[in-house]
Structure formats: C-alpha cells, structure tokens
Amino acid sequence: VVILTHRRPDGDTIGSAGALCLGLRQLGKTAFVLTNEQFTPRFDPFLDGLVCEALPAGATVISADIASEGLLSFDAVRMGLTPVCAVDHHGSNSLACPKLVEADKAACGEIIHAILLELGVSVTKRIAECLYVAISTDTGCFKFSNTTSNTHRTAAALIEAGADVYPINKLFFDTKSFSRLRMEAKLTETMEFYADGTVGVCVMPKRLLAEFSATEDDLSLIHI
C-alpha cells in the first residue's frame, strides 16, 4: 500500500498518512507514504522510516486528505498515480474513486483514527502523535469553528494512548523561525486598513521570501 499526501502538505495530510501507514504495517501490510518534494523538516519525526521514493510493484494507492486530482503532489503526478480509494473530510471531494468522506469531521485524522480502531489496530504512541498532529493543525490547536466534541474526544483518546502533546503544540504553534519573525514585522509595517479599520490587507511578494531566506512553510504559519 502506498499513501498519497496532497500538494503543499500540511499536518493533516501528513499525520493522517503516517498514522494509516503505521496502522497497516501493524496489520502485516507492506505500507509506505509516497515522497512529496514539498515535505518540510518540521514533519521529519512523524515520517521517519515511512517514506518511499518510488511506487513498489503491485501497490495499492490510497489518498489521505486529498480533495481533488489538482491537489495530488507533484511526485504523484510525475509518476502518473491516482488513488484507487480515498479518505477525506472535504465535502467537495471530487476524486473519481471509491472514497470515505465525512464532512462533519474537523480533520482527516479523526476519520483515520476511527478506521484504525475498526481494523483492530493498537494505537501506539507514534500513531497517536501522528493523529494529534493531523487534528491539532487542522483545527488551529482546537480554536477553529470546525472543532467539535468528537474532535476533543478523539484528542483525549490520543493523549490516553501516549501522545506527548506539549512538544507537538510547541513545535507547530509556539515556535517561529527568524525568517518568519522578520516577515511578520515587514507585513505589519506595510499593512493597509480599510472599512474603518476592520479589514487589513498586506502583500507578500515572492522576492521577500528570498530576501528573508524564508520557506513556504514559514509563510503558511504567519499570524498577524
């Protein structure tokens, strides 16, 4: 089994794919997460030992948190891969394959957790931490309006399974690179306000990414 992640991968697609891969391996399956050229170093601990660079012969391809073919990773597109089944939480999912879509879930990680339990997988500390990354990042650390009581119950179950949430929360929500700090300062300085100060607009030209030695990862985490 090879699991696909989406373009510009976030915590939900990576955490969900990692947890599903680990769960399938526990069941005796040969499973991998397909490489994605846009993976960033923050996610390395959660993908360690799980990634393959090419499609093994006869592999079944599954997607995690991918809502359309246009979101397939560049690596998957280059290899001509499309999933034969998909797991997702976006109601707009348009993939032309059998799929499990639960739009009432805040994150794909919630669905993967339920699937693994249904399959009889023992949720290990590592699986729990992958799923916690998935759920916490897609809910803004449980601040977004998509957060439900089931989201909290799932997170509680992951903590009970051994997930060490403090370093995860610190990594994804409390840690800023120097490049990101510089960009936030620049954007705050150049922000323009409209509608009696209720709307703020700022522009981030691509040249500033190079000027600040920043990555797309830094840009996606900016909060002003």
What function would you assign to each model-found segment?
Residues 1-8, 15-44, 53-59, 139-222:
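Hydrophobic helix-and-loop "lid/oligomerization" segment in the mid-to-C-terminal part
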Residues 6-7, 36-37, 64-67, 87-90, ...:
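Fold-independent oxyanion-binding glycine-rich loops
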Residues 10, 20, 62, 88, ...:
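Divalent metal-coordination and catalytic microenvironments
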Residues 12, 71-73, 212:
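Short helix/loop capping segments that flank catalytic or ligand/cofactor-binding pockets
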Residues 23, 77-85, 118, 149-150:
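A glycine- and small-aliphatic-rich helix-loop capping segment at beta-alpha/alpha-beta transitions
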Residues 29, 82, 121:
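Short glycine/serine/threonine/alanine-rich loop segments
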Residues 47-98:
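Active-site cofactor/cluster-binding pocket
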Residues 90-154:
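Short alpha-helices
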